[in-house]
Amino acid sequence: MIRLGIDLGNGYTKFGGMKFASKTKVGRLAGLAGLGNKPEEMHEVAYQGATYIVGDGEPFTAPDRYFTGVDYELCLLTAIGLSSKEISIDCEICVGLPIIPYMSETRALLEKKLNELTKKDKAKITINGQDKLIRIKRAIVFAEGAYVMDTMETDNIITIDLGAGTVNVTQWNNLTPVAYDTVPKSFNKLYREIANHIKNTGRGTVTPAYIEDNFGATEIDIDGKLVDISDTRQMIAKYVSSLVSNVYDICDVPQAKKIQIFGGGAVATADYWKNAFGEEREGIEVLPNSQFTNSEIYQKVIERVK
């Protein structure tokens, strides 16, 4: 049996050091039919009589995304299937919720849905042509952004978990959340705004996904030419500054010994955070390997359960 922490976020599904975009669409991958190569982070998945591409298509970011449609379940089972070479997989999993939904009835509803999966026979899913039989034997829901539960630091600490769809801001004291909120500010929206700005200023057309891949760059390639986009750094600075204002509204910042920042956009925005909080502010930490922080926390949570 395997134990697996899965961070099924608005942007990416992360697990065991692997990831794919939290997107799905009905279709087939040409690479599996011998037409070119299969993209590493896209997977052809057959489930419940339909064939999907997981890792491409449309994101599912609505507040009820855990309960409507097949998308959440599809990404969850795909992550489990990819995590093991075995055909028949028994597993225990830990998944996350943003801090505000976690503190609400959403947690109980998600736990109920996941526990319903544990009562079913093994789910059959075919990933990139390989059949998998998956039985979820236990499912735990944990809070996103709870890095202190990994380090077990008892100091007064603020954690800022930067997601593609939301930002979790939590102040901890003695491992207890004393102030928290889920801020509806989206890196996905920022990527779209930067792409639109480049288009509207006559420099060419790029996708938000391309901006994400080159986030923070001062030059990017458009139509075979290097194009200066250094002015977009001001957009990033304003975004970070606005989030810092949210942090001050939510938390007692002067009391915090550390401010720990992680998530998909953390490393690329490290300097912006230090500038926004002020160069004199000590204790600001941008965590390495930030995109996988939550999945690593969930992994430790499920491994500790007896």
Q: Which functions belong to the PLM regions below?
A:
Residues M1-T159, T176-K189, A209-K306:
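Nucleotide/phosphate-binding catalytic cleft detector across ATP-hydrolyzing
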Residues G163-N168:
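Ser/Thr-glycine-rich phosphate-binding loops at phosphate-binding pockets of nucleotides
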Residues Q171:
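A translation/RNA-centric and nucleic-acid-associated enzymatic feature enriched
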Residues G202-V206, Y210:
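Short, basic interhelical loop/turn and adjoining N-cap
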